[in-house]
């Protein structure tokens, strides 16, 4: 097994889905070894980018695979790739020990559909559920709800997209 320091970052995307009231979609994670306690189980949709895939297309695909949502309009994109390391204690088990963390491109998208479109229990395309429940949350609360090692990424995403939190 490679040394932790030598492991690459997994290329991923994340989506801040914002409704008409300016609230953000968060899902309660179905589980995973990277989650440290029950108070930090909420997160926004995110996932891997396939080789050669456009990042916005990957973001829409991941959003659909995790939430069944297709009704979105792209609002903004964080200009930089944001990086986080997973704790060394779980690095050997997460992603089969192939990565030390993620390199993420984040997008903000306006949800233009009805809440009834959202289905995290039986998500689009027959994918395995990654969330057990969901809710709309004020943007400023997000960093406190995520696992601590992802918090700096969430703080940056909230800072980048804070002007989008107003209701439309």
From Swiss-Prot:
Pfam families: NUDIX (PF00293)
Every Nudix hydrolase domain range: 8-159
Cofactor(s) named in the record: a divalent metal cation
PROSITE patterns noted in UniProt: NUDIX
Enzyme class: hydrolase
Matches recorded under SUPFAM superfamilies: Nudix
Main function: Accelerates the degradation of transcripts by removing pyrophosphate from the 5'-end of triphosphorylated RNA, leading to a more labile monophosphorylated state that can stimulate subsequent ribonuclease cleavage.
Family of this protein: Belongs to the Nudix hydrolase family. RppH subfamily.
Protein name (database record): RNA pyrophosphohydrolase
Species of the source: Rhodopseudomonas palustris (strain ATCC BAA-98 / CGA009)
Gene: rppH
